[in-house]
Structures are given as C-alpha cells and as structure tokens.
C-alpha cells in the first residue's frame, strides 16, 4: 500500500511518500521538504487530516495508545512520533525513515491523518518540562499536509 502527503506552509513545501508492503512490514517514508531553516525540525503524524485552520486544526500527535511522547526508537512513544528531520544550508530536508510503529493498514492507519513539520528540534521527550512528554517542545507548526492513498 502507498500513500502521499503534500506539505504546505508559509514558505515551506514538500512531498512525502509512504510505502508498506503488508500490515506486518515497516513503513518506508521518503521525500523532500524545502524552505525550512538549517537545523533539526520535529516531524510528526498528527491525529486529524484537517487543515481548515492551517496546521492548527491537525490536532495533537497521533497517540491511540495514550503513551508519552518519545523518540522513534522508544517503546513508550506516540504512534506519530517520527523524531526530527534535518534541513541543510540550502533549506532542503531529504527524508528517509523506516518506522515499525505507524501503519497504512487497519484501525490505527495514518491514512487520512496529517504530517506536521515544526519550527524547533524535537527533544524526544527528554526535556525538563511537562510539554516535553506531550509535544517534545518542537515549537510552532511550519507546514503540514493530509496523508492520502496513492498509486503504487
């Protein structure tokens, strides 16, 4: 199964592709986002595929199992916690992620939800504030898009 997400924001745009062979396989995430300042930026699946009020209407991180925010490698993490992407000096982020928690199949599918890229680096739940365990202190939402089915 394949999905696509077109990221739009103020000066930020990109295309993210998702591929999963079956419901037991990892999801391969690939793409490019342009327009982000150099450095790391939080990158998450959010609960709603709603962009009527920009990225704010995308809701919180997708978290159907009610866990704390964490790193993509943590057992205790939101399903939507994909960590950080890194933008180079040319304001381009090349994305190549393999994730074993998100899925394109079944009740907890990410299809119809959204991807949000944030202003700051995600602290992966290791910060000293309560927000660290909820949002990773990743800051404002710079760009987002709805994850939709695509041709294989």
Curated annotation (Swiss-Prot):
Keywords of the record: Antioxidant, Copper, Disulfide bond, Metal-binding, Oxidoreductase, Zinc
Listed SUPFAM superfamilies: Cu,Zn superoxide dismutase-like (SSF49329)
Cofactor(s) listed: Cu cation; Zn(2+)
EC number per UniProt: 1.15.1.1
InterPro entries from the UniProt entry: SOD-like_Cu/Zn_dom_sf (IPR036423), SOD_Cu/Zn_/chaperone (IPR024134), SOD_Cu/Zn_BS (IPR018152), SOD_Cu_Zn_dom (IPR001424)
Reactions mediated catalytically: 2 superoxide + 2 H(+) = H2O2 + O2
Keyword Disulfide bond applies: yes
Entry GO terms, CC: cytosol; mitochondrial intermembrane space; mitochondrion
Superkingdom of origin organism: Eukaryota
One Gene Ontology term of the molecular function aspect: superoxide dismutase activity
Cofactor detail note: Binds 1 copper ion per subunit.
Residues that hold Cu cation according to the record: 44, 46, 61, 118
GO BP terms, alphabetized: removal of superoxide radicals; response to oxidative stress; superoxide anion generation
Pfam families to which the protein is assigned, alphabetical: Sod_Cu
Function: Destroys radicals which are normally produced within the cells and which are toxic to biological systems.
Family: Belongs to the Cu-Zn superoxide dismutase family.
Protein name, as recorded: Superoxide dismutase [Cu-Zn] 5
Organism of this sequence: Dictyostelium discoideum (Social amoeba)
Gene for this chain: sodE
